[in-house]
Amino acid sequence: MSEKLAARLEKLRRRHPQALADIYRGIEKEGLRVDSKGFIAQSDHPQALGSALTHPNITTDYSEALLELITPVTREVDELLTSLQEIHQFVHANLPAGESLWAGSMPSLLDGDESIRIAEYGESNLGKIKHVYRRGLAYRYGRIMQSIAGVHFNFSLGDDFWRAYQEVLAQSAPLQEFKSESYFSLIRNFRRWSWLLMYLFGASPALDRSFLNGRDHKLDQFGTDTLGLPHATSLRMSDLGYQNNAQSSLKICFNHLSTYVKTLYDATHTPFPRYEAIGLQRDGEYIQLNANLLQIENEYYNTIRPKRVTQSGEKPIQALKRRGIEYIEVRCLDLDPFSPIGVSESQIRFLDAFLLTCLLSDSAKIVDEECSIIEENFLTAVSRGRATDVELVRLLQNDYVQGGLQEWASRILEQVELCARELDAIKGGDSYAVAVRDARAKVNDPSLTPSARTYAAVSNGQSYVDWTLAMSQAHHQTLIANPLSPERMQHYVRAGEQSWADERALREADNLSFDAYLKQYLTYV
């Protein structure tokens, strides 16, 4: 595998030496607003942060308290991190007194479902759609699951790269068709190897008892209210976190764009008996958009998604079907509790090299048997990935072979290092090599992983809530102590004001009743 990857990199270097410079990235970082005691905030989305419906950089995810901070798309890692830092600085400067952003992926203190306010988006029809969709999630899965936070990493390559890579592979298909097929190749390898990201960057080995809300569990207890597993990397991505039994019946295919689109289309058009029993309205108000297996495509949970920016009135799968894949969205990353902005430069650079490795390596179609093995490997890594005896299953020369996690991780890192070297050669310096070196150190010494560091803190006297609250408040003080320049502060003030004007314009432009708008919204061309 490494030989073919190395050969492709060598051809790109020789024929198109700048092709790998054509990387584009964006980050969507979630964070729960909490009060001074560590309880989920009950306050409204702060007015100064603009309209959650229309602001380009600051919105809410599921709950009124769950902020989502969105960077512009950038070509440079430094620029990406600067944007994320600035958005955090502006947000922290405008939080209600006593509030901070929760540093952990697993939520703060909760008091049942009712303590989690569903996000509000105003009185426009689009705003109501977003709110009703979230009400539907509450009835289907409960609100507590929706209080989990993470980082989404968006990744794409420009047409200069794609033309170069198509030439290297001697492919003659239309460029967009080639891009979509190649992105699916990336996705398949990502699914095979994403357990490595959980090992390296998972940071949720423990949680507060209030998250379980009386559910059965097999977690160990530390002190009064902290629960966890000694070798877990990411309870957020385990069956305690994002779980969806109804969706387990979905066999989402990542082998071809057409079958992926069809499967999602069918799921958004197939009634599901349990959701039909919920009904669409109560007391004259909508409580879900429809009773289908998925209300809309976004309800489908996975560790990675193919994406295409939608046009006005267009649904995600319509955009994919019409114009193909534009970028991929990595969705399995925990917040880094040790970083004020939830991610680090080393992590971003590793992701660049890792995703290129997924793309440039051979990627056979995934059959049902391998799909089950992929899911089992992932669950093993999130629940006991740091155990010394943990083993995973991989496909080797048409046979499934069991082996140690660390051995397989080392083999993957050898390939990632090849891509890291090429990126360093193009960009200058050794920042990509350092990122891989950091990853290798974690593979050799599990105590260096963020999950181990978090577990050590919360299993030695401090509760999960106390430790995470202290980290959250420390990050808040760090960001407050380093305010934006007046010019950048004014930029975000104006963006907030413009978002309110945009939201008002949307509301005033509505010329349909909500019933008619919803019917139109759910109609696919």
UniProtKB/Swiss-Prot annotation:
Catalytic activity from the UniProt record: L-cysteine + L-glutamate + ATP = gamma-L-glutamyl-L-cysteine + ADP + phosphate + H(+)
Superkingdom classification of source: Bacteria
GO biological process, one term: glutathione biosynthetic process
Pfam families tied to this protein: Glu_cys_ligase
Pathway info: Sulfur metabolism; glutathione biosynthesis; glutathione from L-cysteine and L-glutamate: step 1/2
InterPro entries: Gln_synth/guanido_kin_cat_dom, Glu_cys_ligase, Glut_cys_ligase
Keywords: ATP-binding, Glutathione biosynthesis, Ligase, Nucleotide-binding
Enzyme class: ligase
EC number(s) from the headed UniProt entry: 6.3.2.2
Cellular component GO terms, alphabetical: cytosol
Statement: the UniProt record of this protein carries the keyword Transport: no
UniProt GO molecular function: ATP binding; glutamate-cysteine ligase activity; metal ion binding
HAMAP family: Glu_cys_ligase
Family statement: Belongs to the glutamate--cysteine ligase type 1 family. Type 1 subfamily.
Name listed for the protein in its UniProt record: Glutamate--cysteine ligase
